Amino acid sequence: MAKKIMFQGTSSNVGKSILCTALCRILYRMGYKTVPFKAQNMALNSYVTKWGDEIGRAQVAQAEAAGIDPIVQMNPVLLKPTGNQSSQVVLMGKPVGVYSAKEYHTHYSLTALDKVKESLAFLDENFEMIVIEGAGSPAEVNLKANDIVNMRIAKMTQAPVFLIADIDRGGAIASIVGTLELLEPEERDLIKGIVINKFRGDIKLLEPALTF
């Protein structure tokens, strides 16, 4: 059984993908058979594996960092925006239809969860380390019931979670505290560390916030 670690963010674009990529490379250099995993990705541009399956490009970069070929199990669900609040759903590398956001979250996402579980089981059996990436924020209370990419995955795998915030855009501390407060106690227990990304300058200016 593979060991697992997960990166989640206080929002999109806080640096989850690049930190996952970096960790894949570090673990690869340490000699671990490592694989990236993101249950559900939203991206307009995809990559086609040598088996003809579409997956998100971020997982392709992470696979390269881990020294392996990209496979569909790294990203079983890909959402490709088509406009008008709808997306083409790509399941296990193949398009299965176009759904509105409401249709997907209320009728389809939990159906896709079976393939997510199958993908995780495959990776668990064939690798030593799984670097898991979340999406958006785990504290989106309006989407939580049908979540298949953040805390549902963390609880399913019991992966230690590191929460990332981007201090460069401001509001990092508030976003960290707000995210933690919106999590359920058993979810909060899975958070093992906080990453304040893109910090520059004198660390002493940050210390009062760290001891808050």
What residue spans do the PLM features occupy?
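Flexible phosphate-sensing "switch/lid" loops adjacent to ATP/NTP-binding sites
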Residues: 1-212
